[in-house]
């Protein structure tokens, strides 16, 4: 199973549908948070994405309000159920929608994001779900019984997205809340800074990315390996006690300095193929630490040329 990680490419229903037709079956839909819409858009300098080679982006990149995002995901969910059956593209139950929420526990427990989570877990009472069933029945009357039986449970899993510098205690509180209070299979997104400055610098230099500039402050402020391992052990035990799955999303983007006017501002976040060597090193360390038993959702420079090798390594 593979598909788009949370980002602008998994924000609109038509993009999710296009990804499905291209073979994607796992969709980590765009992250939602309490600050949204125009309020969030005003905080993002433009342009906010550059992908000439390795990828760079500014923090955040959405103009949708949380209810609008929810509607996009419900539309995509219902459309894929019908399209998969009508066009014989695979099992109507053969794909997964994974929520992504951030960026602190207060915001996640607030009315806006809490309602989103509840509605994604059960969309049956939402106006959008009811409208989708009505429209699809009109378009495909021969499938009315199938359409009426479409599950309103759009998502049963979530990825925790936190800002760089988020304290480990806050990360654990968020994940624990989602496991215990929401009953969701939960993945925690990790930052490449967990590798340490020296390792990250050595890896990127050896791969020809010596021109990418960063200092040590994010490495000092972000989650440390010594704090991460026992926290992940506790969260795994908690998930096991609830009959749920726990895992790690590898990896978040990598904060670097803006030195060549790539994007506005002094700092940006790296992704794409230059992130791959850092993320695969994270996978290796975590897999060794947890004897290959830690679930990993990989999203750090995965592409056509390395997907087969990732699967062969047992990352899927």
Model regions: which residues?
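Short, well-ordered coil/turn segments that N-cap beta-strands
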Residues: 1-2, 23-25, 182-186, 242-246, ...
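N-terminal capping/small domains of soluble enzymes
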Residues: 1-183
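Conserved, mostly hydrophobic/aromatic
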Residues: 4, 188, 248, 286, ...
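Glycine-rich beta-to-alpha transition loops that act as phosphate-gripper elements at the mouths
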Residues: 6-10, 252-254, 293-306
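Catalytic cores of alpha/beta
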Residues: 13-19, 175, 301-316
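Glycine-rich phosphate-binding active-site loops on the catalytic face of alpha/beta enzymes
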Residues: 25-37, 190-192, 308-316
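Extended, H/D-rich, highly charged conserved domains that either
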Residues: 166, 170-183, 187-200, 221-225
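Glycine/Thr-rich beta-alpha phosphate-binding loop at enzyme active sites
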Residues: 196-292
């Amino acid at each position: 199973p593979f598909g788009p990680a949370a980002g602008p490419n998994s924000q609109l229903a038509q993009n999710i549908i296009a990804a499905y037709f291209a073979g994607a079956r796992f969709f980590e839909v765009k992250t939602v948070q309490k600050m949204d819409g125009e309020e969030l858009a005003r905080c993002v300098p433009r342009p906010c994405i550059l992908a000439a080679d390795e990828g760079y982006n500014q923090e955040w990149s959405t103009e949708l309000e949380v209810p609008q995002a929810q509607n996009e995901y419900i539309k995509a969910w219902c459309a894929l159920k019908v399209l998969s059956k009508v066009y014989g593209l695979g099992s109507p139950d053969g794909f997964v929608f994974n929520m992504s929420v951030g960026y602190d526990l207060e915001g996640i427990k607030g009315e806006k994001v809490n309602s989103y989570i509840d509605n994604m877990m059960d969309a049956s009472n939402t106006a959008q779900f009811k409208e989708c069933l009505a429209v699809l029945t009109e378009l495909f009357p021969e499938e009315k019984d199938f359409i009426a039986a479409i599950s309103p449970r759009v998502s049963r899993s979530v990825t925790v997205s936190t800002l760089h510098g988020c304290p480990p205690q806050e990360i654990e509180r968020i994940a624990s809340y989602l496991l215990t209070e929401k009953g969701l299979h939960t993945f925690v997104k990790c930052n490449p800074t967990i590798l340490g400055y020296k390792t990250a610098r050595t890896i990127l230099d050896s791969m020809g990315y010596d021109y990418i500039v960063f200092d040590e402050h994010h490495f000092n402020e972000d989650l440390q390996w010594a704090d991460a391992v026992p926290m992940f052990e506790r969260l795994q035990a908690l998930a096991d006690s609830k009959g749920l799955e726990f895992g790690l999303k590898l990896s978040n983007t990598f904060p670097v300095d803006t030195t060549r006017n790539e994007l506005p501002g002094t700092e940006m976040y790296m992704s794409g193929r230059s992130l791959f060597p850092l993320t695969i090193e994270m996978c290796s360390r975590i897999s060794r630490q947890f004897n290959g038993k830690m679930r990993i959702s990989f999203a750090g420079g995965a592409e056509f040329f390395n997907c087969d090798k990732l699967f062969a390594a047992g990352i899927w």
